[in-house]
């Protein structure tokens, strides 16, 4: 059994609830999709009104793939690359050269792991603090959604009420596209 969070809206807030589900090991897309289906079945088992959306390149839903940080673009660059390239560390960064790499290569660049403690994000000549912890990621993600998707596609986010990212492990990471998609839904729910 594995555990992953799902993000939803409750009483005007984005909330996270962890679900246990059967994990299908392996790197094949089919294995990831079996794990996603298992996670979504656990969510639906707990809430019969659940309409979960996996937000990643592993999603079976076109909308989930389009909302992936590996597909969204901002100023012609993939969102994942912008996020990784904007990191400022004690001994290096930002690393604008990461904008030109494939997203998975940018995410795995050694400098991101060997430059000391993360101190800020720098994007478009503006520094973003580390607190609140997700402010920079949420900002560029929402901007990229607006920049990449058509209005009807953005509105379609409201058709879902749970958001997941099978690759997101809260023990290893802070930012997730699933939570930021839930923020977008919250904005629609509260402000139209």
Regions picked out by a protein language model, each given a short descriptive name:
Residues 170-184:
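Active-site nucleophilic cysteine motif
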Residues 3, 59, 95:
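Phosphate/adenylate-binding glycine loop and adjacent helical scaffold
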Residues 142-165, 177-179:
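A short mid-domain helix/strand-loop element embedded in enzyme catalytic domains
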Residues 66-68, 77-147:
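A contiguous catalytic/ligand-binding core that recognizes phosphate-bearing ligands
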Residues 186-191:
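Charged low-complexity "KEKE/polyampholyte" interaction tracts
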Residues 54, 59-66:
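Compact, well-ordered interaction domains used in eukaryotic information-processing assemblies
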Residues 1-55:
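Short, extreme N-terminal leader segments that mark the start of a protein/domain
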